[in-house]
Amino acid sequence: VMFGPDGNNLLPAQVLYKKNILALRGSFRPVTKVNMDMFERAKELFFSEKKVDPENSQIIFEITLSNLRAEGEINERDFLDRAELLCSLGQNVMITNFQEYFKLVEYFSEFTKARMGLAMGVYNLIQIFDEKYYRHLSGGILEAFGKLFYRDLKVYMYPYRDEEKNEFITSENLKVHPRMKELYKFFKNNGKLIDISDFDQEIFHIFSRKVLKMISEGEEGWQEMLPEGVAETIVKKRLFGYSKSRIKT
């Protein structure tokens, strides 16, 4: 399912045909300033590529149902609320059933042979290099990586701040499983993994799950962690467990 900024259904075949595609996967529960910083920085890098014409490109915020299942029973209203907030920020939103990134890329490849980009945080990149996600494939992780990186694809990696070491984790100091080291180095050295370096260091304390907890428990302060206009919509429509009666005084 795909929605445009106006909230109306879109046909992926029409929207994505022969387009350059940049996709951001997340739970967006709710969308935070960190999500939008990743979006802005990845978009700058993607559009700076010689092969990418911004006029012939689509950016998609993707929510996968497999993540929703991990949170328990799928609540249709909940993920439609997430999509609505993203649409209100002027974005295209796609709800898919693809757990693995290579399946998402294969799907996009049905519509285009142009450049593709995936923007993601460190945690998601670590998952890509985790063999357990590919045990169902006869060729294992190598088959998945062939399907993922064989295409004209780049991954834009948003850093993570390690609070204990007080350092940012990037593709340079990221630790992957010893068996994956050479594979990781191969894709990094071939320019498939690009670090997002021009990021906002002031917002790294913001996590969607923390915001969600603050909303549901009636704590103050979560509003400042969200993009402009999002908090007002959450309050107005009482999304994510928000209730005026539960606000602490």
Positions of predicted regions on the chain:
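Nucleotidyltransferase catalytic core that binds NTPs
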Residues: 1-249
